């Protein structure tokens, strides 16, 4: 090991809530707030590159980007109603057209239980199917009683 870093405080804390609304109230009003991980992962990439040059974690960062994208799309679509459908549709349409989304999809390596369908729907830009499938997944995940 040439360099070693010790951080005396957590740099990231992830808490899995029991329902999708707990991460933010009315997420559909400002859905971009759900996707703040994009900046965090970019900063991690920049940090690693500044110390190691082109880092070997590009695949892992791309995979993480896609995993968090899937999680947040499911949370967002879990709040789908006839009143917010157009806003969610418009956001997702613009979001999946982003070059970072397209680039990072190729690094996604789903483990057992991870979504294989959502990345395909993103690649094919099948927005309606993506919205309804994510809504279905949110119902499965968060409406267990």
Can you say where each PLM-predicted feature lies in the sequence?
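Secondary-structure edge/capping motif, primarily at the C-terminal ends of alpha-helices
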Residues: 18, 48-52, 75-80
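Nucleotide-sugar-dependent glycosyltransferase catalytic core
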Residues: 4-40
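Short acidic alpha-helical/loop segments enriched in Asp/Glu that coordinate divalent cations
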Residues: 16, 56-60, 83
